Amino acid sequence: MGVSAYFALRRPPRVEMDRYVPASALAYVEINSFSDIVGGLTSTKAWQELAPALGIPDEISRAGLAADLMGRTGVGRDEAVIAGRAQLALVLTGIEAEGAAGEEGAYINLKPRFAAVVETHSSHDLARRLAEKQAAALAREAFGESINEERSDYFGAQLLIFPGPRPDRQLVAASAGSVVIISNHIAAVETCLDAISGRAPTIAENATLSERRGEVGTDAAVFAFVTEAGIERLIEFLPALLASRVTTDPDRISTVANLSDHLLKQTASGLLYSAQFESGGVTEKYLTLLRPNMAAAIADPLKSATRANLESLDLVPSQIEDFTILNVEGVGELPDRMLKQLVPRVDVVAGLALREFVVSLRKQFGLEPTDRLGDALGNEVTLVRFGGAEPTAMIVRVKDRPKIAPILDRYLAEGGAKASAVEYNGVQVSVSSHEDGRAAAFVGEFLILATRDQIAKMIDAHANNAGVGRDERLAQVLNSPPARAAIISYKPDVRDAAEMMMAVAAVTKSGPADQSAGEAALARVPPSLSFTEFRDYGIITESRSAVGSFSLISSLAGK
């Protein structure tokens, strides 16, 4: 009987979804179990703390278990059984772009071609019926109740096509064996059918994917891969999009876009991502693959230093937006080392731009061309963002104050500004008349470069033992950082988790919410912490947070 129960409750064997994805795809996202996603989310600390306060029913937590059980046994409505068994690959096969103009100026309208490829683990007839039913429902939702239906044949597979109100809009569905494909373009469906049938190579044959997938985990709840071709295609649009956020001047937009294009094309060659539920939260890993000559050039100067006690955190107040710690050997000479490594490996345009950037950076901090800081600074630099329009504050461990003193004087006097000394809580603060409100102060072994008000908050945090270094939630997640982490970032705000949970409450019509209980529960939700390492093949970042990218649920729900 036990053997019978084992086979009756065993999940259908998983298929390798990358064998359904065409090699020509720009990117794909893989989800192997929806029930695992539901079960993982409802087991997070954020869900367990906030769901009761928002009146979200326990039935949602049990839904994942029920779906998994129906998927294993095959008992239940066809759609429910398939939901419990299905594996999904979202495939990006292409991106079209067109320029447009609006009230706020010109912008780029991107139109991705994508396909949802679903392994139903069911019969061909059931998969075909499901494809037709779901495609018709989606078409009505997208185009209205009055829809037209067309059919065509592609190597024996029947394509169901629903034309949209414009020639460039359509919804297409097809099935192949137990696989269902639904897409916004017929070419995407045909490309996926070619891969599934063996008429075209699949992304499973991609050497980078085979070699590096293990770096982010082979059994993640969510996995994604952007190919080298995908990176190159995205780079065509990304610089212009980023530049338009930096400036509104057309000439400067063009300059920034061209520079970004030069650097990105010569640097990145792929991206891998995974998300997994661990320790009451979500662990996400990002591996940005770099071209071999660039990876070594970046990894060497950004080699992590032996991690100290991160004493700078005792100066960081709890009421901040986030902080980032740079823990790198010889941090004082980092810009020059990076420049020395990168310039020989990029083209002339990018090389000149990098030189100008380093010169400008040194000048901003009062450094003359002959100044060298390597032996004057420690390995710990902390950047603190207080939020809003406030400038970023910097905390630097200093080993040689006399060497730093003339540089600090030039920093405070930049642009002809005058500096004056004031005392705050027993600490001398040098305040500049510069328009950006810059000021400086030494507290113990650390130099603070910030505004006068920010420095006061840091002095108070240190004097009252109220810095984030005393936060038990932070201490817990800092217990086991990757050994080679050169950058550590922390974000205490967990509003993204709250917004996700409120979206779930709205969709499920839960309630009423207990506001006071919700605020208390939110204080117990773990903050976000990430670690970045630079390796000889790329950059890997591990993020540990309350809900991770699943916070996008709030956007999908329109909340």
State where each predicted segment sits.
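Flexible, glycine/threonine-enriched loop-and-boundary segments that flank and lead into catalytic domains
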Residues: A376-G378, A421-D436
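A conserved glycine-rich beta-strand in the N-terminal activation segment of trypsin-fold
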Residues: D168-R245, S433-A513, E519-L522
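Structural boundary/hinge residues at secondary-structure and domain interfaces
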Residues: M1-I161, R166, L209-A268, L272, ...
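Short, exposed beta-strand/loop patches in secreted or surface proteins that constitute
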Residues: E149-D153, L171-A174, Y273-Q276, K418-E423, ...
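Solvent-exposed coil/turn segments that connect beta secondary-structure elements
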Residues: N32-F34, E119-S123, G177-V179, H185-A187, ...
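Short, solvent-exposed coil/turn segments at beta-strand boundaries
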Residues: K111, G156, A174-V180, G281, ...
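C-terminal regions of mature proteins
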Residues: R397, R524-S551, S555
